[in-house]
């Protein structure tokens, strides 16, 4: 892939980058097509661009998805929405939903910026109606139902009363009802009961009012495993960025990684047997070997938990990471290989090396966290 333009996360001198995250918008488009092939043309797709689009750059991801016909976008909170709107001119018919339950002092920001607000309780609905009335404007809201995640949302038992309150508020416009699955990769049992609770709420509302409302529940795992949960709209996050929702599970959808996290070899040396590498001397050379130092550490997003667990790709060859990963640098055991030189590219995860899922398993975490951890000092480059 060749670089077409750059998104700088920090000012950098001319010359090769030390660490960079290559962002393939072509792979993003491919992944969207894979998702649409599953859901069908009648199902809307909400592009989840919270957390800076899982570290990929919310501005460029949103623009790419809009060009592919996506008009719904999800962010974590109102501040993420405002940042996106300041950096990108959204199309007139595009919508942003902020998932967080708002503080009362933030409600006017939703009105100012035209962001859809999540309502989880009566107090928020009443405050929103009062503020919207004072502004002389209508506020678009979506009801979040807690069917079993235990995080945000009204209980199914209280949902009908809250929906009646929203309906009675002339300055609130209900644009959707949604829920979130706790175990979306396991469609039977608890997840099936969550969906049943949710559909009971939405069905009762539509029967009582004679209105239809946008219903959405399926995140990446449910898109794959729960056809009945796709409803009117789906919310792909990790799947959109090319990772399977369960890192240990075989991929059933041919998505491609959108990010490649890579750095540079900045030093190579030969060490004798018994030489300890890095802090706390957690690894020692069993025999004479060559050690490469790479200019990326945990401050760049290469987790310390990967110490002595990860593998790194250099020149198409896989090498074990050795010693404790430090804040700014990582060491790799080259063995007797003498082909690696200073300046070579070292792929930490991506299409030319180990996957984010493989590294996540080695670190005892999930690919979501690895993608979101790639830090600001790593330059994002669109390819």
Curated annotation (Swiss-Prot):
Keywords: Isomerase, Pyridoxal phosphate. SMART domains: Ala_racemase_C. Its cofactor is pyridoxal 5'-phosphate. It comes from the Bacteria. Pathway: Amino-acid biosynthesis; D-alanine biosynthesis; D-alanine from L-alanine: step 1/1. The keyword Ion transport does not apply. Gene3D superfamilies: Alanine racemase, Lyase, Ornithine Decarboxylase, Chain A, domain 1. One of its GO terms (molecular function) is alanine racemase activity. The active site is at 50 (proton acceptor), 279 (proton acceptor). InterPro entries: Ala_racemase, Ala_racemase/Decarboxylase_C, Ala_racemase_C, Ala_racemase_N, Ala_racemase_pyridoxalP-BS, PLP-binding_barrel. The keyword Isomerase applies. Its EC number is 5.1.1.1. The modification N6-(pyridoxal phosphate)lysine is found at residue 50. Substrate binds at residues 151, 327. SUPFAM superfamilies: Alanine racemase C-terminal domain-like, PLP-binding barrel. One of its GO terms (cellular component) is cytosol. It catalyses: L-alanine = D-alanine. One of its GO terms (biological process) is D-alanine biosynthetic process. NCBIfam families: alr. Catalyzes the interconversion of L-alanine and D-alanine. May also act on other amino acids. HAMAP family: Ala_racemase (MF_01201). Belongs to the alanine racemase family. This is Alanine racemase.
């Amino acid at each position: 892939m060749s670089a077409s333009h750059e998104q700088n996360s920090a000012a950098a001198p001319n010359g090769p980058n030390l660490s960079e995250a290559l962002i393939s918008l072509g792979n993003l488009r491919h992944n969207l097509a894979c998702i649409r092939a599953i859901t069908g043309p009648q199902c809307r797709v909400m592009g989840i661009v919270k957390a800076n689009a899982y570290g990929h750059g919310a501005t460029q991801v949103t623009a790419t998805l809009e060009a592919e016909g996506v008009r719904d976008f999800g962010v974590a909170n109102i501040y993420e929405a405002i940042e996106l709107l300041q950096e990108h001119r959204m199309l007139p018919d595009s919508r942003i939903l902020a998932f967080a339950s708002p503080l009362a002092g933030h409600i006017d920001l939703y009105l100012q910026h035209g962001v859809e607000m999540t309502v989880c309780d009566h107090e928020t609905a009443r405050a929103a109606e009062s503020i919207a009335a004072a502004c002389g404007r209508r506020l678009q809201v979506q009801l979040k139902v807690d069917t079993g995640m235990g995080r945000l949302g009204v209980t199914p038992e209280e949902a009908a009363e809250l929906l009646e309150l929203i309906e009675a508020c002339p300055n609130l416009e209900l644009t959707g009802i949604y829920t979130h699955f706790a175990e979306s990769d396991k469609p039977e049992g608890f997840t099936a009961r969550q969906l049943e609770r949710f559909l009971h709420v939405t069905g009762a509302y539509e029967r009582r009012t004679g209105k239809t409302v946008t219903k959405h529940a399926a995140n990446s795992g449910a898109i794959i495993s729960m056809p009945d949960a796709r409803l009117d709209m789906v919310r792909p996050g990790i799947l959109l960025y090319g990772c399977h929702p369960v890192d240990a599970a075989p991929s059933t959808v041919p998505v491609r990684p959108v990010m490649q996290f890579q750095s540079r070899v900045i030093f190579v040396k030969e060490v004798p047997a018994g030489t300890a590498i890095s802090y706390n001397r957690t690894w020692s050379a069993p025999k004479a070997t060559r050690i490469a130092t790479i200019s990326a550490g945990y401050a760049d997003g290469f987790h310390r938990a990967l110490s002595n667990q990860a593998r790194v790709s250099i020149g198409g060859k896989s090498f074990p990471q050795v010693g404790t990963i430090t804040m700014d640098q990582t060491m790799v055991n080259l063995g007797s290989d003498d082909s690696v030189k200073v300046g070579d590219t070292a792929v930490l995860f991506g299409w030319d090396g180990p996957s984010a899922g493989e590294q996540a398993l080695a670190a005892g975490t999930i690919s979501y966290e690895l993608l979101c951890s790639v830090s600001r000092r790593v330059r994002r480059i669109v390819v």
